[in-house]
């Protein structure tokens, strides 16, 4: 499992002109799932993200987690994170999980994030989405389970 995590001042996701998910501040997650991922990977990533100390304390050091600052999470499914661009000019997405499997694991992942005590908004799995955010910092990390 691969997640691109962005610390966000605000974020939203729109499908067909309608906002389907929105947070005031917290973390925006682009979530990629490969066919080898399991529920164990999803739980590991959910716990890691909830507890990563990437929000600043009073002295400007990254000492607080999204839980500590009472932030929220906007989770967006993103199969293109497993695009392989090493050969040719068109990405190969063979490492991305099949949609049925990926959607089930993506839903499980979001529930695991909620179990950590976080409010989670989502996009619409498999839809063409417009994602808007104000990246705070910018702080952008890649979190992987393997």
From Swiss-Prot:
Tell me where the signal peptide lies.
none
The record's InterPro entries line, in alphabetical order, gives:
Daa-tRNA_deacyls_DTD, DTD-like_sf
Top-level division of the source organism's lineage = Bacteria
Extract one GO BP annotation from the record: D-amino acid catabolic process
Please provide, in alphabetical order, the Gene Ontology terms of the cellular component aspect for this entry. Answer: cytoplasm
Q: Which UniProt keywords apply?
A: Cytoplasm, Hydrolase, RNA-binding, tRNA-binding
Protein's cellular compartments: Cytoplasm
Please give the Gene Ontology molecular function terms for this protein.
Answer: D-tyrosyl-tRNA(Tyr) deacylase activity; Gly-tRNA(Ala) deacylase activity; Ser(Gly)-tRNA(Ala) hydrolase activity; tRNA binding
Per the Swiss-Prot or TrEMBL annotation, the motif Gly-cisPro motif, important for rejection of L-amino acids is positioned at: 137-138
* EC main group: hydrolase
**Protein's job:** An aminoacyl-tRNA editing enzyme that deacylates mischarged D-aminoacyl-tRNAs. Also deacylates mischarged glycyl-tRNA(Ala), protecting cells against glycine mischarging by AlaRS. Acts via tRNA-based rather than protein-based catalysis; rejects L-amino acids rather than detecting D-amino acids in the active site. By recycling D-aminoacyl-tRNA to D-amino acids and free tRNA molecules, this enzyme counteracts the toxicity associated with the formation of D-aminoacyl-tRNA entities in vivo and helps enforce protein L-homochirality.
Q: How does it assemble?
A: Homodimer.
Q: What is this protein called?
A: D-aminoacyl-tRNA deacylase
Q: What is the gene name?
A: dtd
């Amino acid at each position: 499992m691969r997640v691109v995590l962005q610390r966000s001042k605000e974020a939203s996701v729109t499908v067909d002109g309608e906002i389907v998910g929105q947070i005031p501040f917290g973390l925006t997650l682009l979530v990629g799932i490969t066919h080898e991922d399991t529920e164990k990977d999803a739980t590991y990533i959910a716990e890691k993200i909830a507890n990563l100390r990437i929000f600043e304390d009073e002295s400007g050091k990254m000492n607080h987690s999204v839980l500590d600052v009472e932030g929220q999470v906007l989770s967006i499914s993103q199969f293109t994170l497993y695009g392989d661009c090493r050969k040719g000019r068109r990405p190969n997405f063979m490492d991305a999980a099949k949609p049925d499997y990926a959607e089930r694991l993506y839903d499980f992942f979001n529930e695991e994030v909620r179990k950590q005590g976080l409010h989670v908004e989502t996009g619409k799995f498999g839809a063409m989405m417009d994602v808007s955010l104000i990246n705070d910092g910018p702080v952008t990390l890649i979190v992987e389970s393997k």
